[in-house]
Amino acid sequence: AGIKTNIHYVLGNNSIDEAIERLQHNDFPVGINAVIFLLHKPVGLGCEENVLHINDPRVKKFFEIVDNQKFNFKIGFDSCSIPAVLNLTKNISRESIDTCEGARWSMYITSDMKALPCSFDNQEMRWAYDISNDTIQNAWDSPQFEDFRNHFRTSCAGCKNRMSCMGGCPIRPQIVLCDHIEKTV
C-alpha cells in the first residue's frame, strides 16, 4: 500500500536480549522503514527492574551491533538514549543526533492543564506549571521550566560530550547510560 512502517521497540532488561538476537540475525520484518529504539523509563507502568545500566555487557553489545552492522532499514533512537549513543558508538554521525528536547523544543500538558517540560515528570510534577488560568508562554518562561533547562546548561562540566548530551535526563537520572567521571546527574 506504499505506507512506510516504523517499529518502535522499547529497550529494557526484559527486551535487550531479543533486540540483540533480531539485529544479529536480521530478524525484523522485511520491508520496514525503520526500527526506533525507545529507552525503557521507570514511569507509569514501567518498573525500575527494566532499567538498563551502562556496565551491563548486553548494552555494550547492543550498541556495538548497531554501530557496526549494516541493515536493510534505518535505526533510530529516542533522545533519552543519546548518552549511550555518544558513549558507545563511533560510526553514528554526531550531526544526526539531538538530546532531550524537554523545555528546549517541547512541553507536555496534562489533562488537568499542568505544563511539564516532559511527560515523564507527570508523577512527581517537580517542574509543573499550572496553565488552567495562565498561558503556555508563561509556562515556557516560568522558573520551573528555567530550572529544568538549567540542568542542561550546568551538568557534567568538563565532559567532551557535554554539548551533545547535556547530562541526560534530570527526571530519571538512573536511565542515563554514561560512565564518565564528569557525570553529575
Give residue spans per PLM region:
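Radical SAM enzyme [4Fe-4S]-AdoMet core and its adjacent flexible, acidic
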Residues: 1-131
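Flexible mid-to-C-terminal extensions adjoining Fe-S/redox cofactors in radical SAM and related proteins
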Residues: 114-115, 119-185
